[in-house]
Amino acid sequence: METIRILLDTSAYIAFLKGHPGVKQAIQKADEINLNPMVPGELLAGFMKGRREARNREILQEFMESPRVRLRAIDEETSERYAAIFTFLRGKGTPIPTNDLWIAATAMQFGLRVVTTDRHFQQVPQIIAETHA
């Protein structure tokens, strides 16, 4: 049986908390849930603007402490893949947000399926994006 390894983007984490059935199912089925450092960074920035910062931090910490969740570091190989994706998309005239480029680079590096609610990941042919709108 194949191991299901996903990379969760920020939009999917938020959708999961809101009970989005497709995202919830993708997370429940996954053997390994990966995060790029941009995801907790974006989430923490959002928490700081809200009224429930402490509670949201607690929920995120509990999620990240799961034995199925793995935080992937950005290294030289990730940077090379970022540059390749950036150059490719810029050449096509279809750029995506910078943090999502890092997420795509991480997915490409480790062969992970990106679970997201953002359609722009589908512009990156080097990755598999599972989009839940």
Please report, for each region that a protein language model flagged, where it lies by residue.
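Short, well-structured N-terminal submotif of metal-dependent ribonuclease cores
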Residues: 1-39, 45-62
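Histidine- and aromatic-rich ligand-binding microenvironments
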Residues: 8-9, 36, 95-97, 118
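Alpha-helix capping/helix-boundary segments
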Residues: 12-13, 78, 102-103, 120-121
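Short, hinge-like loop/turn segments at secondary-structure boundaries
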Residues: 50-54, 89-90, 131-133
